[in-house]
Amino acid sequence: KPWKMMGRMHDKYLIADGKTYILGGRNTYNYFLGDFPGHKNFDRDVLVVCDEPQKDNSVNQLWNYFETIWEQEDCRYFHNSKKLADRQSVKKAVLELQEGYQQYFEVNKEKICDTDYADETFETEKITLLSNSIHTQAKEPVVWYQLGELMKNAKERVKIHTPYIICNDMMYNTW
């Protein structure tokens, strides 16, 4: 069905140990990873640590979102066959990734192992995760509406930290 061809999951998140997650905006195309002159695009990742995970928090909200996605009819393994893993090109790619990680780790191990994330993060009063409806067809702007409602309730200011939004002039000037 042509209207489903572009239906893909673009979510990037990693949930660890039931109390920590990373929301990512990291894209792997060279435009985003390379060091090119001119316009520089910075993808941002958001680290969230919930010291005391309660029932109503963003860690559990993200976990429930994952479960909902996982159960969708459209969600399935792209390739899950032994034949694919046995291909020489796949074996080569796996080896390149392993070697690349090892090199990265050797150069950055102090940052990786000795970073006190509590010193490099700040406490929030509230984290609200938003998403549009979960289907492959065109979507209504539900997230934009939800953002507007949250902004209307702000006491003093609104700070949006997300790797996913690109605002146009109308969006900046609406609320």
Where are these regions (language model features)?
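Charged, low-complexity intrinsically disordered terminal segments
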Residues: 1-12, 16-175
